[in-house]
Amino acid sequence: MEGRGPYRIYDPGGSTPLGEVSAAFERLVEENTRLKGKMQGIKMLGELLEESQMEASRLRQKAEELVKDSELSPPTSAPSLVSFDDLAELTGQDTKVQVHPATSTAATTTATATTGNSMEKPEPASKSPSNGASSDFEVVPTEEQNSPETGSHPTNMMDLGPPPPEDSNLKLHLQRLETTLSVCAEEPDHSQLFTHLGRMALEFNRLASKVHKNEQRTSILQTLCEQLRQENEALKAKLDKGLEQRDLAAERLREENTELKKLLMNSSCKEGLCGQPSSPKPEGAGKKGVAGQQQASVMASKVPEAGAFGAAEKKVKLLEQQRMELLEVNKQWDQHFRSMKQQYEQKITELRQKLVDLQKQVTELEAEREQKQRDFDRKLLLAKSKIEMEETDKEQLTAEAKELRQKVRYLQDQLSPLTRQREYQEKEIQRLNKALEEALSIQASPSSPPAAFGSPEGVGGHLRKQELVTQNELLKQQVKIFEEDFQRERSDRERMNEEKEELKKQVEKLQAQVTLTNAQLKTLKEEEKAKEALKQQKRKAKASGERYHMEPHPEHVCGAYPYAYPPMPAMVPHHAYKDWSQIRYPPPPVPMEHPPPHPNSRLFHLPEYTWRPPCAGIRNQSSQVMDPPPDRPAEPESADNDCDGPQ
């Protein structure tokens, strides 16, 4: 647009193209959606942590109830233990249910949702309290603990380390981004906008990498939570199986006890019935024998009862130790969970603040984009109005040029009979000059001797002489008239030539104006095409991202145009034909009327003369001139040819 015409549109948005601004805006929108997704992930992680805490508390209550049940259960009698062993032999299963630490620490495996596969056998002697920032603690596995006496040696443990210490880095990146945005907003020089946008892109890239790392960490934690949940379900199933086996064993022991009681009652009844027919001595002997048998059976049952009691005490001690370890692990997990909860709450607040700031930036950018769009629409309306004005001016100039061409042809048609009349008058003057020369030669010839008075020859000569004198006077008067006509015709022709030159100059000026308006119209059309292409690109970008509803601007809001239009020549009506009323020509042989000039012409006001061309061909030419075929607007070359035509 620069250097091509006076119509340069001022762009208040600087030299930044609209495509790059829209691309940066789309990047900001995508970053905003990504941050929203991350916020939702963090919320889901908090919900998972709450669920794991509830599950841990529930499992803790179940473990405490199991410990209470194991403490309150009384030791069984010797025959019941013997029958318990017999039941084991009958069923072929291990009825000695050992509630090892894996069952009691099921809560810890589900509660450690943020630690992953960190599993280790309990080490009660070497327990270090958690400091709230580390997430490593021991969990008793179910696969590697075969017996409670096989030592608690450490196994594979995956330490995730402290929670991500990248909050400070994120804060620094966000502070840098805020500083770059503030500098970009306060920067008066718009040429530095690309450098600021590059810095902003670098900061966004760094933030994206940090957030990607956090996403990876959260995904790892989610997978670990899922694994721990599965382990928790497996431990629950094992615990339920152990409880069912214990209930079945207790039921079988009760049944054996009732059967033994029945057998004892039957045996005592049989002994009583057998001892009745005998004497009292054998009865006393039988009683003594029964008492001895009972004492022997009691002494025999005391030995396995003492062994079972020792095993039960060992089990109780082991369960107590596991309960203490479980309480300690639960305390550590509580501390760690609280610290993690505080950290994630702090992160959530920071991310909410960042989201609010980014939303503010997005709204500001949206407002700027709307303002630029309005300015662009105003410029388009201004350019369209200017194009319409130029087109109207061009139409007026073409109409005026057409009128001037008609005027030139009309004057040409009027000039042709005048030239013919001039030729006729010149021939007549030549003839009269010849006749005058002959008359003068006759006068200058020597006169004959005077004849006698009254002779017929003298009278005829005298009459001839008088006729020649009168004819000479008449010829002199005609010559004067012809000279006057010739002088008038010459002055009229000179005046017509001057007017013709003036008309040529006016036609040249109008042609220059037409060429200038054509060039300006061409440049404006090119600008409009470029703006239409930009609009199409913008619409495509809007279709891929968010839609923008443009406000209509029907009115012309811009002020006066700062650049001046090229000066239009003052079209003053010519009054050069007012003196033509004094010219009196002799009547031509063929009187014909000529059509008057165009009545709507605002350039010339011709006097109402009755032009009478001598021939009929002129009428045909004038009719062709007055009704020309509609042609396209005159180009500079055709206008020059029209001007050079009437010579």
Curated annotation (Swiss-Prot):
Region of interest: Required for inhibitory activity of TNF-induced NF-kappa-B activation: 444-601
Composition-biased stretches (Acidic residues): 637-647
Cellular location(s): Cytoplasm; Nucleus
Compositionally biased tracts (Basic and acidic residues): 61-71
Stored Gene3D superfamilies: Nemo cc2-lz domain - 1d5 darpin complex
Post-translational note: Phosphorylation at Tyr-565 by SRC-family kinases recruits phosphoinositide-3-kinase (PI3K) PIK3CD:p85 heterodimer which results in integrin activation and leukocyte adhesion to activated endothelium during inflammation.
Biased composition annotated in UniProt, kind: Polar residues: 143-155
GO biological process: one example: positive regulation of protein deubiquitination
Modified residues (Phosphoserine): 77, 297, 416, 455, 638
Record keywords, A-Z: Coiled coil, Cytoplasm, Inflammatory response, Methylation, Nucleus, Phosphoprotein
Location of Asymmetric dimethylarginine modifications: 584, 612
Composition skew (Low complexity), residue ranges: 102-115
Sequence motif Nuclear localization signal, location on chain: 537-543
Modification type Phosphotyrosine: residues: 565
Keyword Coiled coil set for record: yes
Region annotation (Disordered) ranges: 61-168, 613-647
Name recorded for this polypeptide: TNFAIP3-interacting protein 1
Organism the protein comes from: Mus musculus
